[in-house]
Amino acid sequence: MDPIRRHLLKAAGLFVTSRAFANDQQGTSMQPSSVKPRHVLCFLGKDESLLHPPEAVARTIADFGFEIDRTYSQARPDPHMERSFGVCWDRVFPKAWSAADEAAVANHKAVLYLLSPPLEQQKAVAFSAAALRIVEEMIEAGATAVKGESAGIAHGLERWRSLGDQARKGAKTSQGLGMTLAVAKACRLAFAKRPLGGDRYNETVGYHLVGLPEIYVAKSRGNEWAAVMLMEELANAMAERSIEATLRDQKLTLTREQDYAEDDFKFNPYGIIRVEA
């Protein structure tokens, strides 16, 4: 077993509380939700072999507690995929997908869905890193397109590979492998989408997959790029110093009010931070 795989398995099962979660997660009197997030990964392929991953990949899926959703996976094209990927492509990172990626979506012949186990907040980054590892192995095995359903985010194959590489390299420290800030950031970039334009805010969705609350930035503060920069700044601060400390230092508060119902995969049980004008 390679060191990265061993490290991820250990982190997912024997995770030691890190600085990002050293204090009260809410930083307010808000009662915690009992909802636990889950990854839903969507893979497209050229034929029905997609539904039967190679033994090595199947072992990785099982080792990390993921499972194939046999109800919605299918050995035929899904006519809605072009539109779905069209609204999910990451539009922040330059050239996050290519014409070849669009063609792969248009020409797919099979769809596979994977579900993660419910995520504990302290283990969210570890399981997201595992999800990224599974994405890499599925691409290696022939998957032609990948989308994170829990936040509605899609990247091209090269971008997925790059994010996986970032997570691997980011796990290396002078003391060995660790769930570092670099790993958390790679997972956030892989599985969260931003900015989504609401009526009043530019919003994130998917930060629950790395154990963080969503960040909503008032549109009156500036353009979308300014909102993305602030989202990154606050997310990095929460991962490094703790949610509570960041809320205190920035004089921000959490709220539970959100548009997603608790049974929606986009529901964030850790709340929302609204940054007003």
Which ranges hold each PLM region?
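N-terminal export signals
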Residues: 7-24
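Aromatic/basic-lined ligand-recognition segments
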Residues: 153-249, 257-258, 262-277
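Internal, hydrophobic cores of structured domains that mediate oligomerization or house catalytic pockets
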Residues: 82-182
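N-terminal alpha-helical "arm" segments
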Residues: 27-48
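C-terminal segment of N-terminal export signals and the immediately downstream linker at the start
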Residues: 1, 19-33
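Structural alpha-beta junctions
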Residues: 62-71, 133-147, 236-246
